[in-house]
Each structure stands twice: as C-alpha cells, then as structure tokens.
C-alpha cells in the first residue's frame, strides 16, 4: 500500500511541447524576415550588375528582364574607351610652395589610358593612403591617451569624443579653407588628410591600448627600451586586431566618402570612380547601361573586400568593445 501511495503522490514530469513549437516558429519567422531584408538590400546590386551586361533595348524595355536574355560587354567597352589621359597623375604634397606660380606640382606615371582606369587608380590610392596614415596616427594617439599621463589628457579625449558627433557638413567650410590655404585643393591629398585625423580611429585604438598591461611597458623601460622600440615591439603587436578593424573601416569609409570627394575635387584628372560615375551620368543621362557599368565598377570591389575581411572586422570591433 505504501508503494502504491508513493506512486500516486509522485507527479509526472511536465513537458512543454508547445514552448518548443513556439521557439521553432519564432526562429522560422526570424529567418524569413532576415531573408526578406537581405533580398531588399541585395536586389539593387543585382540589378546594377545584370543591367551592366544588358543591351540598351533590354534596359529600356517596358517589361523588365530579371535575367539578361543576351549578355553583352558593350557598356564596359564604352566605359573604358573614353577620353585618354596619363595613367596616373599625382600632386606633390605642398609642392606649390616651391613652384613659381604657386600652383600644385604634378608628376605623371605610365602611358595614356581611359579616364575610367585613372579614376579607379585615384580611388585605390586615396583609400590605401588614408588607411595607412590613419592607422599610424590613430595607433600612436590612442596609445598616448591610454597609457601616458599628461596635463589635459581627459579634456583632450573628451574633445575627441565630441568631435565624433559632429557631422561633416559642420566642419566642411573650415576644411575647405584649410586645404585652399595649403594649396591642396583639387588634389587627392585634400581628401586624404582630413581622414587621417578621424576621431573614431583614435577612440578605437585607445580602447585597445587600455588592455595593454602596464607591467609590460614598465619592464621594457627597465630593460632600457626606447619609447619607439616599446611602441613597435610591444604596443603594436597587442593592438593588431584593432589596427586590422580600423584599416578595413577606414578603407571602406574613404572609398565611399562621396561628399568630401565632391567638394575637394573638381578637375577630371583628379576624379575618383564615384565622381566619375556622376560625371558620366551628367553627360549620358539616357545611357543607363554605361551608368550601371560604372556603378558596378565602383561597388563590386569594395563589397568583395568587405566580405573577405568581414570576420576580422567584426572580431576587432568586438574585442575593442570588451576591452573598453
């Protein structure tokens, strides 16, 4: 009797199949919503790429072709058969100070090439130089703000954080006057130098530098290491993930900074690929195939670079957030 009574008192385990079903339905709904958003974001890129391989009749047809019935390279042939110019023409930084008429000093490299190739070279040079110089200056400034003690350090960091909130339109006129006074206006350097002082880069590298053990720095000083050797041999290896994330971020930001390029550059020889596409659109407002070919040339490389280094970018940003 006691065994039967104990069996009656024992309650069966409760199961929640409905909860599992609700969780499964929630996950399915989430995946559906994410897929819809992904399609909405990816469709314009798909339309540009496929449209660049369509004929003019197919692009202007009343019934759109979701997949080209005939693949042609006519639009890219027109894009790369435009006006010829030296393959690359670069202004010497501050070279106007040494010229007789005060104009920038240029040097040309390579044979003549279509304007689109030159625009692409200008864009790559601008993005790479911005990335290198920003990483160098931000790493040094972030390390100094994190590990050096000097008067006004907190105030300086507060000003940097406040500068991050300022839109580019607010500082546009001072930047324009500064570049003009340095005779850098209408040169590629007028776009590069403002990016080098990017406040976000300093903020990010300071967060990474905060995680460097002070004991390592003190041990290096005791061993007689100079400040430069300590920075190169100890600091840089420990903030490498942050430098990688900042490099990708700066490269993409510089490549896509259409507004600053539009204000600082005017001559055809100094245009970037984004400005070149806008110029093509102004001159060929009805040639949508040519415009799509230029847009694809500008968008596809940066998307590929981001997809390749996306893992390192997100990892670096996450590590910086944790250390900060």
Across the structure, where does each feature detected by a protein language model lie?
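Short, Lys/Arg-rich, polar N-terminal cytosolic tail immediately upstream
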Residues: 1-21
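A structural signal for multi-pass alpha-helical bundles of membrane permease subunits
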Residues: 18, 26-324
């Amino acid at each position: 009797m006691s065994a039967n009574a104990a069996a009656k008192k024992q309650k069966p385990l409760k199961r929640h199949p409905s909860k599992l079903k609700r969780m499964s339905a929630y996950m399915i709904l989430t995946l559906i919503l994410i897929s819809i958003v992904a399609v909405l974001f990816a469709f314009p890129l798909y339309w540009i790429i496929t449209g660049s391989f369509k004929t003019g009749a197919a692009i202007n047809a009343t019934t759109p072709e979701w997949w080209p019935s005939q693949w042609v390279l006519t639009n890219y042939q027109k894009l790369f058969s435009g006006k010829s110019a030296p393959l690359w023409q670069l202004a010497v930084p501050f070279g106007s100070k040494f010229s007789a008429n005060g104009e920038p000093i240029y040097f040309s490299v390579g044979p003549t090439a279509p304007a689109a190739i030159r625009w692409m070279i200008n864009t790559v040079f601008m993005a790479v130089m911005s990335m290198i110089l920003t990483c160098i200056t931000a790493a040094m400034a972030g390390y100094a703000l994190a590990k050096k003690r000097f008067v006004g350090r907190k105030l300086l960091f507060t000003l940097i954080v406040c500068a991050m909130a300022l839109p580019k339109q607010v500082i546009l006129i001072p930047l324009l006057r500064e570049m003009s006074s340095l005779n850098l206006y209408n040169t590629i350097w007028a776009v590069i130098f403002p990016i080098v002082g990017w406040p976000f880069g300093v903020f990010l590298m300071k967060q990474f530098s905060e995680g460097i053990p002070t004991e390592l720095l003190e041990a290096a000083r005791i061993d007689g290491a100079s400040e430069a050797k300590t920075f190169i041999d100890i600091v840089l290896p420990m903030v490498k993930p942050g430098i990688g994330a900042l490099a990708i971020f700066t490269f993409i930001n510089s490549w896509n900074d259409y507004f600053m390029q539009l204000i600082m550059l005017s001559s055809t020889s100094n245009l970037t690929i984004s400005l070149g596409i806008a110029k093509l659109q102004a001159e060929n407002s009805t040639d949508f195939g040519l415009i799509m070919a230029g847009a694809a040339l500008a968008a596809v490389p940066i998307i590929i670079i981001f997809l390749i280094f996306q893992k390192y970018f997100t990892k670096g940003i996450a590590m910086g957030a944790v250390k900060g």
